Amino acid sequence: MARKTPIERYRNIGIMAHIDAGKTTATERILFYTGISHKIGETHEGAAVMDWMSQEQERGITITSAATTAFWQGMDQQYPQHRINIIDTPGHVDFTIEVERSLRVLDGAIAVFCAVGGVEPQSETVWRQATKYEVPRMAFVNKMDRAGANFGRVVEQIRTRLKATPVPLQLPIGAEDEFKGVVDLVRMKAIYWNEEDMGVTYEQTDVPAELADEAAEAREFLVEAAAEADEELMDKYLEGGELTVEEINRGLRARTLANEIVPAFCGSAFKNKGVQALLDGVIEYLPSPVDVPAIEGELDDADGTVATRKPGDDQPFAALAFKIATDPYVGTLTFFRVYSGVVQTGDTVFNPVKGKKERLGRIVQMHANSREEIKEVRAGDIAAAVGLKDVTTGDTLCDINNKITLERMEFPDPVISVAVEPKTKGDQEKMGMALGKLAQEDPSFQVRTDEESGQTIISGMGELHLDIIVDRLKREFKVEANVGAPQVAYRETIRKTVEQEGKFVRQSGGRGQYGHVHLRISPQERNAGYEFVNSIVGGVVPKEYIPSVDKGAYEALENGILAGFPAIDVKVELYDGSYHDVDSSEAAFKIAGSMAMKEGFMKADPVLLEPIMRVEVVTPEEYMGDVMGDLNRRRGTVQGMEDGPSGKIIRAQVPLKEMFGYATDLRSATQGRASYVMFFDEYQEAPASIADEIIKKAS
């Protein structure tokens, strides 16, 4: 089969936003105008095509990023047909993992902002993640029909809060209930979408007289931004020459792809205005797979040589699995992005992370929640494979003869844990299987069994995250569970350097055991992790035993020494020791390493660390005193305040331990008018009173 759409006409994009910016509605409209979805689903009624998990329909927030394929030729059919793959990303902070994961596989993104709420704290989080992955972006200021809508103010916030350079390509004609259409600043025309056919067709007129001055000024800014793309355009601009529409678009595209500017559009998805022009912008300014740097990976050799895979059909096949979903009809769906090469159904590919082969039995392309079986996928495509055996999020799928591991995604460690037990004994096994499936779908969710109590402990990124997991147990797997009180994920570390001997000797007839080491144990900077250094000279500890010493020390730290929590940021140096020709073994040195670690750790001024969360509360001014007082009572430190569109924004650092049940307390303190977001910030030393209590409990 030949390629239907040239790869230059692909756009793999994500739509990212704060919870209520109207992202799902915008995505719905995109699907409507691109002719796949003939009935526009409204989030308010809980029926949007993209929101296909039933919980999302109840909560009205988007949890799983579904991937959808759509086609677009422009409002005037002015382009050849382009293929747009849309990855829907959740806006809720407990799901930033989903956002990271989708940003990893997209080439460009649309950031949706509410014209009233502007840049909310959550938008900043997502924006930072997009910057980390160098994703070119456009902005869509939505909800222009709402009371208090102000396009200029939101553009200014993008500049000041997100430290970006927005370039408005449109101006709104009217606002709030007078919002009628937009001025297209590139072509200097006014566009009014027809309400009879839900905005499929539109009228084009001259710019309204009352907006002429403002439009001329805005266009000057836009043309200058385009001219800065290259010397040829700049020279023409400085010599007073008019840039053509083509030249302006060429300049804007180059600067958007270089992450220098953010083209800004406006509209009201709900009122069917502006999304059509936004789609033209996707084609005009966002990258195709060919416009972004070739993906890098490690080859299957001893050195892990770094190689690239270019986005071409003639390259060896390489793809990244970015989401696992359990589908009630077909079982496990593995969503993957193809970076290079071609693969057909029935082909066998290799997963280098697991070291296993996988056969691609069926490949489907998803449209939100309906699916189409396809025979092959090519570079640039996003599709889902049915029933792969052992592939987790972040794994690579590649050609068996050209093995490569694309960079792993990094997932944060969970910060909150709860014990769960099934309400009926008979559900124990069912619950175990269900939790295993959910953990495979979501790497930021972990399951383990507590060795002492035998309880099943689940851990995640926040209370909402775990609520949804428990909810899914009930809904998808029919397991009713009781949930214990939330537990905080503490860590341990040390404050000073010590030297410690560890000696494990057993001599009792026959072969004995002999392992003897000297370790230098020292603290590392926060987030530096565990480091093992071998400084043995002259073979006093033979080479083959050194990994065992490392393993013994590391496992002792992993299991916790002070109070049973994993110890972090510790450097271990093996600098001396001795061995016995007959009695020494790997096991003996592992025990010696572990003994030295446990003893040395307790002498190295050990401390307990607690997770500190970044909390951002948006509250009406009259409740500000109460909210701040409450944060102080929770051992919080307020770091700053500013005026937001819907009240004061208070930024604080608060220990996670003090934040349980905060949502309910905040609601009652402010009569439901305040909202907050919270995400993990860093580990800090826990105060002695709290540490002592926890250590006492552990012993």
Swiss-Prot record:
Pfam families registered for this protein in UniProt: EFG_C, EFG_III, EFG_IV, GTP_EFTU, GTP_EFTU_D2
HAMAP family, per the entry: EF_G_EF_2_B
Entry keyword set: Cytoplasm, Elongation factor, GTP-binding, Nucleotide-binding, Protein biosynthesis
Localization: Cytoplasm
Record-listed GTP binding positions: 17-24, 88-92, 142-145
Family: Belongs to the TRAFAC class translation factor GTPase superfamily. Classic translation factor GTPase family. EF-G/EF-2 subfamily.
Domain of life: Bacteria
InterPro entries in alphabetical order: EFG_II, EFG_III, EFG_III/V, EFG_IV, EFG_V, EFG_V-like, EFTu-like_2, G_TR_CS
Species this protein is from: Alkalilimnicola ehrlichii (strain ATCC BAA-1101 / DSM 17681 / MLHE-1)
GO terms classed as biological process: ribosome disassembly
Gene3D superfamilies in the record: 3.30.230.10, 3.30.70.240, Elongation Factor G (Translational Gtpase), domain 3 (3.30.70.870), P-loop containing nucleotide triphosphate hydrolases (3.40.50.300), Translation factors (2.40.30.10)
Signal sequence bounds: none
Name of the gene: fusA
SUPFAM superfamilies xrefs: EF-G C-terminal domain-like (SSF54980), P-loop containing nucleoside triphosphate hydrolases (SSF52540), Ribosomal protein S5 domain 2-like (SSF54211), Translation proteins (SSF50447)
Annotated function: Catalyzes the GTP-dependent ribosomal translocation step during translation elongation. During this step, the ribosome changes from the pre-translocational (PRE) to the post-translocational (POST) state as the newly formed A-site-bound peptidyl-tRNA and P-site-bound deacylated tRNA move to the P and E sites, respectively. Catalyzes the coordinated movement of the two tRNA molecules, the mRNA and conformational changes in the ribosome.
PROSITE patterns to which the protein is assigned, alphabetical: G_TR_1, G_TR_2
Protein name, entry field: Elongation factor G
SMART domains from the UniProt entry: EFG_C, EFG_IV
Record-annotated tr-type G domain positions: 8-290
Cellular component aspect of the GO annotation: cytoplasm
Record GO terms (molecular function): GTP binding; GTPase activity; guanosine tetraphosphate binding; translation elongation factor activity
